[in-house]
Curated annotation (Swiss-Prot):
It catalyses: ATP + H2O + 4 H(+)(in) = ADP + phosphate + 5 H(+)(out). It comes from Streptococcus uberis (strain ATCC BAA-854 / 0140J). The gene is atpD. GO terms for molecular function: ATP binding; ATP hydrolysis activity; proton-transporting ATP synthase activity, rotational mechanism. It is a peripheral membrane protein. This is ATP synthase subunit beta. The lineage of its organism: Bacteria, Bacillati, Bacillota, Bacilli, Lactobacillales. It comes from the Bacteria. F-type ATPases have 2 components, CF(1) - the catalytic core - and CF(0) - the membrane proton channel. CF(1) has five subunits: alpha(3), beta(3), gamma(1), delta(1), epsilon(1). CF(0) has three main subunits: a(1), b(2) and c(9-12). The alpha and beta chains form an alternating ring which encloses part of the gamma chain. CF(1) is attached to CF(0) by a central stalk formed by the gamma and epsilon chains, while a peripheral stalk is formed by the delta and b chains. Its EC number is 7.1.2.2.
Length: 468
């Protein structure tokens, strides 16, 4: 094990010099430095650059407070390794695989895997055409998720990405019954804490591993924590042959941390100040999130859209890797429609007759056509009013508004805020309900009865309570 000494510390960046013929550590190797003489307080560094003359530049995974020049640094000879396997289920830990849930730490001989790996070879990959039912009408109808696919939840600040991902955890993890890995990347600690206790109460935690590198942590930890969660998911997929659900909140923070690290390493910034290696870093992460002939990984990733600008390089780079996109729209939140999923901007590779079936496909495309026509007519309505529309257009607008409201529903995870019980709607009920609305079966029912309900039976009940 070669050793060096700290040459300089600049925030989370630490330069280490290996003199007297000591072997230089490889890129991505983990180095350990002890802050105190009795070796109880250690900090892990990851090698990022080799500067020449025996000097390497590293990124700290924890705060560098207390580090001084001249402290001894040891090369572990391998990348950061984290615990994997059944021991991780029901536990919460950080980027280094250290437990942060006040329970006993992992045993020293626990199985560990390095967080840096190659993506599966082309001939190992497998594709699936099986739909993953979410119980959320707008998703199941218009942008269905594939089992073993990659899903992105796009949205600006405060439009409901985290609530949607929590509802998906509630619906899918409980229905699916398999193993889930939740990775919190650069998000609020409070949200992670709430999610942990909620999972504990529902019993889902027993089949879930949780990894957190939150907002208050150094950029190195936020950049690498996604790989820690992914490594755990890969082990369940490859070694145990499981179908795994991988939730990541938020991929943008992974990019943001990479940008901070890049600037600290002295790289020239690229478009909008992002790191020049943005596409490479995103590709290295996303190519590992895949399904193989041993097992599947279905990933659901929240992706923050800065200033609601979808052309920003961070969300634009992530777009290319996804099977389904669920776009959250601020205008819909202003109308009180939750989840605020844009039915026209969201898309899915799975929405084809071969995968969802002919009836589902026809209903979904007709819903999109009606909503698109309504959007085109909105300018005329705003300027001239409804009276200028033809009778057919008036009927279409009425149905479009009913569809728009019916795409909303109450969430189980939001019950404590709304006071309304959440609803889980099977795909078959969703398709049947929208088909009947399109046929004009419910044109006589007031629009308000369609707002925030489950299946169409709830609409009829609500209308009855309103006196219709």
């Amino acid at each position: 094990m070669s050793s060096g000494k700290i040459a300089q510390v600049v925030g989370p960046v630490v330069d280490v010099v290996f003199a007297n013929g000591e072997k230089l550590p490889e890129i991505n190797n983990a180095l350990i430095v002890y802050k105190d003489s009795d070796k109880k307080q250690k900090i892990v560094l990851e090698v990022a650059l080799e500067l020449g003359d025996g000097m390497v530049r590293t990124i700290a995974m924890e705060s560098t407070d207390g580090l001084t020049r001249g402290l001894e640094v040891l090369d572990t000879g391998r990348a950061i390794s984290v615990p994997v396997g059944k021991e991780t289920l029901g536990r919460v830990f950080n980027v280094l695989g250290e437990t942060i849930d006040l329970d006993e730490p992992f045993a020293a001989d626990a199985a560990r895997e390095p967080i840096h790996k190659k993506a599966p070879a082309f001939d190992e990959l497998s594709t699936s055409s099986e739909i993953l039912e979410t119980g959320i009408k707008v998703i199941d109808l218009l942008a269905p998720y594939l089992k073993g696919g990659k899903v992105g939840l796009f949205g600006g600040a405060g439009v409901g990405k985290t609530v949607l991902i929590q509802e998906l955890i509630h619906n899918i993890a409980q229905e699916h019954g398999g193993i889930s890995v939740f990775t919190g990347v650069g998000e609020r600690t409070r949200e992670g804490n709430d999610l942990y206790w909620e999972m504990k109460e529902s019993g889902v935690i027993e089949k879930t591993a949780m990894v957190f590198g939150q907002m208050n942590e150094p950029p190195g930890a936020r950049m690498r924590v996604a790989l820690t969660g992914l490594t755990i998911a890969e082990y369940f997929r490859d070694v145990e042959g499981q179908d795994v659900l991988l939730f990541i909140d938020n991929i943008f923070r992974f990019t943001q941390a990479g940008s901070e690290v890049s600037a600290l390493l002295g790289r020239m910034p690229s478009a909008v100040g992002y790191q020049p290696t943005l596409a490479t870093e995103m590709g290295q992460l996303q190519e590992r999130i895949t399904s193989t002939n041993k097992g599947s990984v279905t990933s659901i990733q929240a992706i923050y859209v800065p200033a609601d600008d979808y052309t920003d390089p961070a969300p634009a780079t992530a777009f290319a890797h996804l099977d389904s996109t669920t776009n959250l729209e601020r205008k819909l939140t202003q109308m009180g429609i939750y989840p605020a999923v844009d039915p026209l901007a969201s898309s899915s590779r799975a929405l084809s007759p071969e995968i969802v079936g002919q009836e589902h496909y026809e209903v979904a495309t007709e819903v999109q056509r009606v909503l698109q026509r309504y959007r085109e007519l909105q300018d005329i309505i705003a300027i001239l009013g409804m009276d200028e529309l033809s009778d057919d257009e008036k009927v279409l607008v009425g149905r479009a508004r009913r569809i728009q409201f019916f795409l909303s529903q109450n969430f189980n995870v939001a019950e404590q805020f709304t006071g309304q019980p959440g609803s889980y709607v099977p795909v078959a009920d969703t398709v049947r309900s929208f088909k009947e609305i399109l046929e004009g079966k419910y044109d006589h029912i007031p629009e308000d009865a369609f707002r925030s309900v489950g299946p169409i039976e709830d609409v009829l009940e609500k209308a009855k309570s309103m006196g219709y």
